Amino acid sequence: MEDREISRAVIGRLPRYYRYLGELLDAGVERISSNDLSKKMHVTASQIRQDLNNFGGFGQQGYGYNVKYLYTEIGKILGLNRPHNMIIIGAGNLGQALANYASFEKNGFILKGLFDVNSRLEGVAIRGVPIRMMDELKDFVSQSDIEIAALTIPKSKAIEVAEMLIENGIRAIWNFAHTDLNLPEDIIVENVHLSDSLMRLSYTISRYQEDHGK
């Protein structure tokens, strides 16, 4: 693959390809055409071919795609061929829900620590990982091989905690705090606003009702 910039739109579609290909594997499907894959994913076949051509193509004329091979290769592109140790800061409802999501570990995201300020949660184990207090966070991060930190904390604390994590070697932050984090360019940040998708759904409902007179 050429060393060139891949658009965020293409990268954003890769997890969908990976997920659908995993479903096909589970169903025992060995190969699939771009046309059949497009029907399943509700994108055009040409879009699929263009996306995959960014990484070398993977398909054969008249054969389509080998599902297992394509699944494996997209997994490599997404970095899922090696484990990623992660911690969650904030063990409230959202933090615990993330910790309980077993598919993360299936894809190589290994939960190593949970942290919170609520002393009543200290020692409570989520899938075998005990909740620790925030005053342990700095030492834990500096002494552990942690790659990703998920923030499920109030936005008023997000910058302070993010800066401390960066000072202690964290280079990737999955941010669920209700604010966008603007951090140094060498820090990888994925800002997630759960309400955004709900607002898009609300917009679609409103347009549908207007178009159909409801």
Region roles according to the model:
Residues 1-30:
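Extreme N-terminal segment that seeds HTH/winged-HTH DNA-binding domains in transcriptional regulators
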Residues 22-25, 128-214:
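Phosphate-bearing ligand-interacting subdomains
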Residues 31, 35, 40-83:
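HTH-adjacent hinge/linker in prokaryotic transcriptional regulators
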Residues 91-92:
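Glycine-rich Rossmann-fold phosphate-binding loop(s) that bind the pyrophosphate
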Residues 95:
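N-terminal Rossmann-fold NAD(P) dinucleotide-binding loop
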Residues 105-127:
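NAD(P)-binding Rossmann-fold cofactor-contacting core
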